Amino acid sequence: MQGEAATIAALLAVDPVGLGGVALRAPACAERDAWLALLRDLLPRGTPLRRVPLNISDTALLGGLDLGATLQAGRPVALQGLLAQADGGVLLLAMAERMTAAAAARFGSVLDTRSVRLQRDGLDSVYASRLTLVALDEGASDDEHMPASL
């Protein structure tokens, strides 16, 4: 692994929330896997590291109404989404070059405010979301790239 790549992994491990994340433009390959393994090893023990499916729904990402708990409680009960669940952790976003502008805006807002505001289904909640985003941009050509807003 080249020195610059290792330095970037080390910097991200020292202050992941402060840096917000990294865009890693590389195809799925051994070098990329080695960099991700290095980052995992350098992060403090117990730091959550989760993959984000490209087609994740807004409810799974942001949260929403927990229908079962709402019916049982007789009042609206919020279900936290992945962005709130990942507070203090690292999210791996594979195929970031395929991310929609709307999804990029959601991630960007969370990175900027370090919180998730859930306003839907009669809910109005704010959850801490101090996370780090590792965007894996696997674009094969110059016109395939992740949204510039990230």
What are these regions, as identified by a protein language model?
Residues V17-L19, N55, L79, Q85-D87, ...:
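Short loop/turn elements that form and flank the Walker-type P-loop nucleotide-binding site
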Residues A13-L54:
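Walker A/P-loop
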Residues P44-G46, G88, D112:
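Short glycine/proline-enriched coil/turn segments at helix->beta-strand junctions
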Residues L42-P48, V52-Q72:
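Conserved NTP-binding/hydrolysis module of P-loop NTPases
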Residues Q2-E4, E97:
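Buried, small/hydrophobic-residue-enriched core segments of structured protein domains
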Residues P27-A30, A34, G64-L79, V90-R106, ...:
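Canonical AAA+ ATPase core
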Residues E4-D15, G81:
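Pre-Walker A adenine-sensing motif
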